[in-house]
Amino acid sequence: MAALRGGDLRPRLTQGSRGTERRVTQESFPEIREAVRKLCARFPGAYWRDLDRERAYPTEFVRALTEAGFLSVLIPEEYGGSGLGLRAATAVLEEIHRSGCNGGACHAQMYTMGTVLRHGTPAQKQAYLPKIATGELRLQAFGVTEPDAGTDTTRITTFAKKVGDKYVVNGRKLWISRAEHSDLMVLLCRTSLRDEAKTSAGMSVLLVDMREAKGNGLTITPVRTMLNHATTELLFEDLEVPAENLVGEEGRGFKYILDGMNAERILIAAECIGDARFFIDRASQYAKDRVVFGRPIGENQGVQFPLARAYVQMTSASLMVDKAAELFEAGEPCGAEANMGKLVASEASWFAADMCLQTHGGFGFAEEYDIERKFRETRLYQVAPISTNLILSHVATHVLGQPKSF
């Protein structure tokens, strides 16, 4: 498929369906969705099961998405992307996950580059964005979290000291996904000591060339987890980064990172919607096919009701995510909507996962059905990025006006 361009696949609403499902909401970007489905069909469950066993990176899948232009939908056309916007990006990720694939290996390329796009210099944008769009450069790593600074980003201690025409970085990062498979990393670090009166001040963003950094002050250690997410621990020991790689102004990094968080929340929520659809599709078909006591198990309300509830929750969450994406594209404040959308979508996908596993019974635990793999993958999204509890705290404090609880 030729790379996407802005004029190719503008949204046209349709009553499209999947299987025997009669959609109760309109489906946006049908051409994009169909193209993504066709691409994902080339990477069936066996492909993902093999990678999962070895905890290997889906290089071929990411390359195919890049060549098709799906990972550059948020990059403006002037820099080689399609400039289609966030709603198109949500359609891409939703369909990837509905197809049984996983966008976790590459979704950061969609939103991480936004820091450079919004706050980088013209020279930085021209140097990096066109190459990110073509896949010549991979910007997959987002260095924020530390062992003692997860939810509270203001507690990061990784420090970049300005020495002449470079920064010298020392510190440690944890849960940094795809660092081994990224050419560039957006790194949040301190450039001045933490001020208790202004805890979010004094942080800056550096664009790190991982190809030069590895073995020259940067050590990457893989962290094996319950799912294939290519996450790592990073150790910085006098890593030198050119001063020209500072993104925006020194000391304003926390604000720059926050600017991209809403897009991240919305895109992850779209993946959750895709996961929920995957589980609902699988459970619905299995309930029709599986015969017990002489009739399909789907004739029992005990099977029907959880399936129906999963669909209701998924559809409701999808509407919330769509609303958040619309606000984001319109340039309107959408922090609450993005966070709430991510919360309800992650809960919908987890309910659907549990329902699907229960519907399949023992078969759900068999690797060949792909349910246990997707079950493990979708559980992550109630923890990261941003935990369910932190979203609830955000809503209580910033929406309902309650006292800060942390």
Model-based region annotation:
Residues 3, 166, 170-217:
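A short core secondary-structure module
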